[in-house]
Amino acid sequence: MSQFIAMNRFKIVPGMESEFESIWKTRNTYLEDVPGFIRFNLVKGPKREDHVLYASHTLWASEQDFEAWTKSEAFRKAHEGAGSRGHLYIGHPDFEGFTIVEGAGVG
């Protein structure tokens, strides 16, 4: 079974980067005990004229593990209150899912 990468791309209002990052740094993701979860990263991309790009990046043992998480209590808890922070975002997050075909790495 192939590993799976799940990414959400966020367009953040310029000047709101610190607030956005603080939310991610202080929240409980509830991922540690989810079957198939391997790793999480929040990454910051380029600053554009109208937004700053961020992406959440999670690595899963399989796409099935990711799908099961999206239907779980842990997912619901991790996303509580997300709708109350609309002032930070330009539009909705864009989801992208990828099956790993080939890879290399250390450790």
Where are the language model's segments positioned?
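An amphipathic, aromatic/His-enriched active-site/gating alpha helix that lines ligand/cofactor pockets
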Residues: 26-38, 59-96
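Glycine-rich beta-strand-turn "strand-cap" elements at beta-sheet edges
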Residues: 1-4, 41-53, 80-107
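Short, surface-exposed ligand-recognition loops at beta-strand->loop->(often short) alpha-helix junctions
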Residues: 12-20
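Intrinsically disordered, low-complexity segments enriched in polar/charged residues with Gly/Pro
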Residues: 16-17, 28-29, 33, 44-47
